[in-house]
């Protein structure tokens, strides 16, 4: 039996004719074209090893002794048409890890995996059944583009690496057969699930997420994961004002549970154009302590949360799988993907896989010096931390957080090192801390798809011929506040795309969608562009009557080329997955 689920798609409007603009600002182009028909050919430098991978200890990437870190050597396909792609699972801790269920993200080349294919994981010569949840498909043939891979890991000794080869099941391989999907309702009931969030400083309190989840599951739930190893569903509970609490709850076959709880202060109201200044000024930050109680175990988080920001925390019951999520420490299990395969799929840009990355955390200016510095900074991995990013995005020059993707994402891709992964995942979380998360009451991220004349930028508000949003000030960056953010699409970092395709975690897709939506609404609407009425561009684009009031034109002469390029990078990545 095949287990899969499809996610809800983002309400994006894309003008395909402007994709080539990405090459105009040093950003590169064509990194996401993908597909079997037009994929370029690159030299493969990844070491080919047996299709029956072995367990090694220690792994040099984990012990951090290798002077030069090269792309990870992962199991390579041996049987054409059956073997697909390999990964490594690394125990980054100093203690043994028992066998447990684990989920990660995997990009597939077009045509490699069809929706009805059954996958297995070949580990040390033995095949194990795999749960595949389909997160994105290739439009040309419907094959799987991005999947959430859930499997049961073997027991792993401290510092060890286990090679895993994903393959299509053959007649002799074990499968789940008719095993039913984990029943989240029954699992919640049998565990007497309690998942409460209480507040000190804001009301009402508490929020019973377990009861809300039960109500949602008795209707027509949408599952993110749904199979014999794990089932995940989402519940969202409005709290007060623009604050709402979202929880992605996962039940596993052994009865354990995980909850990814989001505190989203992002609901917005659109103000139709009136020609007047914004009458709804920015609201003061919410000051509160949130207590999250899962099965009787509580944690407290005291935060100051401004509007249009989101943060999250992951809680596990005893025995629940350790997730590959950001925190102040390295993930317990690090997944090493096949960089060459990712490149050939079109999911990432092609890198020179022969140079390596110097593994020196003491050399000032080196990548791993930066990684060590960021991880050692007070507050790293906590809600609203910058995690090494430049809060004033208008700052120019020699910044490791701007480029087609960030330096930390690049090092993660090129080395698959757990330290780089830790920083990159934490920076993916930082996308929630930037005040660019604008959600409508209908659940959509705010885009021209709902409000064609919307503009969030300088002079925000219902003046100047555009619609604006309430409680937002583009110029509210206080120079004396080290925790404030100043957004600038011309220098915005690429935060959530790489974390999402590597982990398959829904939180990172939320962050990707939010940033991409902001990119759409931060560009002057086409029909309201001042360059349409006068100046050297007058009539240039409106000469085609079909474009006169087009809501889906997001690149206009009123925007800088680099800003449009980085905007389209985010929009294209969101559309890709």
Describe these PLM feature segments.
Residues 18, 92-93, 151-156, 238-241, ...:
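Short, flexible beta-strand-to-coil junctions
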Residues 62-202, 213, 222-223, 229, ...:
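Alpha-mannosidase-like glycoside hydrolase catalytic domains involved in N-glycan trimming
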Residues 37-47, 168-182, 435, 516-527:
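Compositionally biased, low-complexity linear motifs
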Residues 2-14:
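Bacterial N-terminal signal peptides that target proteins for export
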Residues 128, 204, 299-303:
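Short, isolated positions in well-ordered beta-strands
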Residues 214-577:
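Catalytic cores of extracellular degradative/oxidative enzymes
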Residues 15-57, 62-63:
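Bacterial Sec-dependent N-terminal signal peptides
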